[in-house]
Design a protein with these regions (language model features):
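Short, surface-exposed recognition loops and adjoining beta-strand edges that mediate ligand/DNA contacts
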Residues: 37, 63-88, 178, 214-234, ...
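Conserved, well-structured interaction surfaces
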Residues: 42-51, 55-61, 65, 90-172, ...
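Extended, well-ordered alpha-helical segments in internal regulatory regions
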Residues: 164-175, 239-251
Length: 278
């Protein structure tokens, strides 16, 4: 009996120790200040961080669209509904943000919907994703990886930062442009940029992404182990889509034909790159 009690006591001590270590481990991983930069000096470690960006930003093809999952074939495109051409004009609060007669404010109850759940301070909201992308790029650029490896990884990050801003601009127009990791200061403030500045920023990110990914993806695309990752062609295809949005009535009320021509030329020029990427 004494032997059984001793064994039971040792088992309890061991289990408590494991629980304590497990809790400590989880708490440490939740503290982003303890994320050591050495992880970026190893290609696999850096790639895991890039993979997490895919997980946060890619649409889910098996579910309806939501604030953290963009539109898929199974869901309506909520951001594209943010136009009077689609929704019409009414006194309904759900569509009042496209009604030029409605005063948008929290006091009237009519305001642009918080589609991306930013007010909920959720880590996976669109600004949390952008912060994660900026942090990952800073870590990779400051690492000891070869320039070729840096380009492969940073190129993917640039694409997803452009993707996040494309979704924001479709919904809100001009938004703050943030390219560096900011300290979590409640008093910090970043000025809102114009829609034009945002479009130019998105286009530059996509051009840079296409350049950085060219060596790895324009000779038939990624190898079989990396199938499905973004390529130079992916970046240029999104660039064409962004320029069509900029030329559309949503942002081009005067119907400036040069915007349409620019979008056409960019899409036309991207076709050889898309073919080269497989």
């Amino acid at each position: 009996m004494n032997t059984k009690i001793k064994l039971l006591g040792l088992g309890l001590v061991a289990s408590l120790t494991l629980v304590s270590c497990s809790d400590s481990f989880l708490e440490e991983k939740q503290n982003y200040e303890k994320f050591t930069p050495e992880i970026y000096n190893d290609f696999q470690g850096a790639q895991l961080r890039v993979n997490s960006i895919y997980g946060q930003c890619l649409p889910n093809p098996n579910s309806a669209g939501a604030w953290n999952n963009n539109c898929t074939g199974l869901a309506s495109d909520m951001q594209s509904k943010a136009t009077e051409e689609y929704t019409g004009i009414s006194n309904d609060a759900a569509t009042s943000f496209v009604d030029p007669r409605a005063e948008l404010s929290s006091s009237t109850g009519f305001k642009v919907p918080d589609y991306f759940q930013n007010e909920q301070k959720h880590l996976a909201n669109v600004w949390g994703r952008i912060r994660n992308i900026n942090e990952t790029m800073e870590g990779i650029n400051g690492s000891t990886l070869s320039q070729a490896d840096k380009d492969k990884l940073v190129g993917q990050c640039l694409f997803f930062r452009a993707w996040c801003y494309y979704q924001l601009v479709k919904w809100y127009g001009g938004v703050p442009i943030i390219t560096e990791v900011q300290e979590p200061d409640p008093g910090s403030f970043t000025q809102r940029s114009s829609a034009k500045d945002c479009i130019e920023f998105i286009v530059k990110d996509l051009d840079d992404a296409a350049d950085k990914l060219a060596a790895a993806t324009t000779n038939g695309g990624w190898d079989s182990d990396n199938w499905g990752r973004v390529t130079s062609g992916t970046a240029l295809a999104l660039k064409g889509r962004v320029l069509v949005l900029w030329a559309s009535p949503m942002f081009n009320r005067s119907n400036d034909q040069t915007r349409w021509q620019n979008a056409y030329e960019q899409i036309k020029n991207s076709i050889p790159v898309l073919n080269a990427c497989g």
